[in-house]
């Protein structure tokens, strides 16, 4: 399973570990992904999403129905 947020599309990014001696080695910054189930009143069912905490805040702000409508408009199968 890819480490990609279903709502925001955030993916792992690449950067450097930097030691005290300023040696640099490659590392990955992973998104803070959470598996969450949401009750969708309009569909009378639970919907499972793999989302970041930033997406969770977006759902709190806009509502799950609006977020699901955007996902379906972009072609995501929910």
Curated annotation (Swiss-Prot):
<protein>
    <recommendedName>
        <fullName>Large ribosomal subunit protein bL28</fullName>
    </recommendedName>
</protein>
<keyword id="KW-0689">Ribosomal protein</keyword>
<dbReference type="InterPro" id="IPR001383">
    <property type="entry name" value="Ribosomal_bL28_bact-type"/>
</dbReference>
<dbReference type="InterPro" id="IPR037147">
    <property type="entry name" value="Ribosomal_bL28_sf"/>
</dbReference>
<keyword id="KW-0687">Ribonucleoprotein</keyword>
<dbReference type="GO" id="GO:0022625">
    <property type="term" value="C:cytosolic large ribosomal subunit"/>
</dbReference>
<dbReference type="GO" id="GO:0006412">
    <property type="term" value="P:translation"/>
</dbReference>
<dbReference type="Pfam" id="PF00830">
    <property type="entry name" value="Ribosomal_L28"/>
</dbReference>
<dbReference type="InterPro" id="IPR034704">
    <property type="entry name" value="Ribosomal_bL28/bL31-like_sf"/>
</dbReference>
<dbReference type="InterPro" id="IPR026569">
    <property type="entry name" value="Ribosomal_bL28"/>
</dbReference>
<comment type="similarity">
    <text>Belongs to the bacterial ribosomal protein bL28 family.</text>
</comment>
<dbReference type="GO" id="GO:0003735">
    <property type="term" value="F:structural constituent of ribosome"/>
</dbReference>
């Amino acid at each position: 399973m890819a480490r990609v947020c279903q709502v925001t599309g955030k993916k792992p990014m690449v950067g450097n570990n930097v030691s005290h001696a300023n040696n640099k080695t490659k590392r990955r910054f992973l998104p803070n992904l959470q598996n969450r189930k949401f009750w969708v009143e309009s569909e009378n069912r639970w919907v499972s999403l793999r989302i970041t905490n930033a997406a969770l805040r977006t759902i709190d702000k806009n509502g799950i129905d609006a977020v699901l409508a955007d996902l379906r408009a972009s072609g995501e199968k929910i």
